[in-house]
Amino acid sequence: GLLANDIEEVIVSSSLIDHAASEMPNPLHVMPGNDSANSASKTVGETLNDLLGVSSADYGSGVGQPIIRGMSGSRVKILDNGLVNRDVSGLGADHINDVDLSNVQQIEVVRGPSSLLYTNGTIGGIVNIVDNSIAQEDVQRLVKIGLETQSVNDGDSQSIFYQDNLNDINISFSYKDSSFGDFDVPNGSIIHIEEEHHEDHEDHDEQEEELGYLANSDFASESLKFGASKTGDWGFIGFSLANIESLYGIPYHGDEHDEHDEHEEEEEGHEEHEGERIFSTTDSDKFDLRGSLNINGNFLSSVDFFFRDSDYVLTEQHAEEDDEHDEHDEHEGHSKGPTTFANDTIEAGLIFDLSNDQLSQKVSLNFVDE
């Protein structure tokens, strides 16, 4: 057995006195919006991949979930302007984070247990994506046009952003359309795992050498967002409408799924899986109402309020290669039908600011119907 003197000694020390807040490691990192806007189209995970303690869990070009301190999925939550993004990315490694990074003011990352101060169930951390669709201060006219091309997948992306103050009403509009094909890869870089009893093993070796792309690595998305707000000494009030639609392939290897198909027509089934199209589509609509009223009373300083109505649908589908142009339709004759994840959420809340010169405190009331 293992003897006690064989175990390496670990000494843990702590201080009996409190450390100053400035001396403690800061778990919060704020990334300016320009850092993400000036780079190529990326997922949330890829955008934050260079931060300390943050990495990306890629599952094709469309999916890149952030990993914070080794934790991901439901332990890391994505927030949209302070509210939890109610997609289904936490239910599967191949589910996309349904967020729009085309018009980002800043990205806030909180690592570790400190994230519990902002939302529950996030021991890993949170990523808060902040935009200015509901402006809290008067804005000036700004126009941005973006164009992007990628040779590795014959892809392109176009975006436009406009904001202005018209008759004391702040308005903003953003639109982005991206389309990226399958990734080109060096010949022979994709290795096929063949079963020992396959008679045509040599034929497949020749085919893999001719393969020049990664099947089901494509990604396409279209996002649209409009917002308007009114500001003054009394506070602000505004609303925004957003829609995101996407289609992305899920890289797949047919042979790995054929090990359980021990029937007489194994070779025919294998050929069908080789040409199988695996992809997911998403469609989300979101309405936000947000505002703040300055009370400036002896007991109550201000009242913030918000309301969000969001509808999200993710559909996973299988299609044969010949029917690739009918990706949004049902495919007859296939043994596996589409799988749909849907989440309709209504969320509302009030935040009462009871702060004064000696004390800073707030009381929050939240309601969620999911």
Show the residue positions of the predicted features:
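N-terminal periplasmic "start-of-domain" segments of outer-membrane beta-barrel proteins
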Residues: 9-37
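Extracellular loop and loop/strand-boundary signature of outer-membrane beta-barrel proteins
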Residues: 92, 144-147, 157, 209-214, ...
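Face-selective signature of the C-terminal outer-membrane beta-barrel domain
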Residues: 231-244, 282-370
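N-terminal periplasmic accessory domains that precede
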Residues: 44-47, 64-67, 79, 95-97, ...
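Hydrophobic, lipid-facing positions within transmembrane beta-strands of outer-membrane proteins
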Residues: 8, 64, 123-125, 141-143, ...
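Short acidic/polar hinge/loop motifs at secondary-structure boundaries
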Residues: 84-111
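Periplasmic-side early beta-strands and strand-to-turn transitions of outer-membrane beta-barrels
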Residues: 140-146, 157, 161-282
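Extracytoplasmic beta-strand/coil segments of soluble accessory domains associated
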Residues: 45-87
